[in-house]
């Protein structure tokens, strides 16, 4: 359960980083 939770959280964080990256790229352009 805890492992699954941490894995899910990690995935969400990674997705958030990617979204932030895309957002910053859009702002730069």
From Swiss-Prot:
Tissue: Expressed by the venom gland.
Post-translational modification: Contains 8 disulfide bonds.
GO cellular component: extracellular region
Presence of the UniProt keyword Disulfide bond in the record: yes
Coiled coil segments of this chain: none
Key words, A-Z: Disulfide bond, Secreted, Toxin
GO biological process: defense response
Domain of life: Eukaryota
GO function terms (MF aspect): toxin activity
Disulfide bonding pattern of the chain: none
Compartments where found: Secreted
Miscellaneous remark of the record: Not toxic when administered to crickets at doses up to 5 nmol/g.
Family (UniProt): Belongs to the CRISP family.
Name of this protein: Cysteine-rich venom protein 25-A
Source organism (scientific name): Naja haje haje
